[in-house]
Curated annotation (Swiss-Prot):
Keywords: Arabinose catabolism, Carbohydrate metabolism, Isomerase
Species of provenance: Klebsiella pneumoniae
Entry keyword Cytoplasm: no
Name of the protein this chain belongs to: L-arabinose isomerase
GO cellular-component term (any): cytosol
EC number, as in UniProt: 5.3.1.4
Encoding gene (name): araA
Reactions the enzyme catalyzes: beta-L-arabinopyranose = L-ribulose
Lineage start: Bacteria, Pseudomonadati, Pseudomonadota, Gammaproteobacteria, Enterobacterales
Length: 43
């Protein structure tokens, strides 16, 4: 389930993106951009 996937992603320090009925494209794109900055800086 989604909670397990979130825990897995957190444990392995990987990005998890969730697209569901509540997803709005502009905010989703913003989140992807910010995640790219965050995860890119951890390399």
């Amino acid at each position: 389930n989604l909670d397990d996937m979130r825990q897995f992603a957190e444990l392995h320090d990987i990005e998890l993106t969730v697209i569901d009925n509540d997803t709005r494209l502009p905010s989703f794109k913003d989140a992807l951009r910010w995640n790219e900055v965050y995860y890119g800086s951890k390399r």
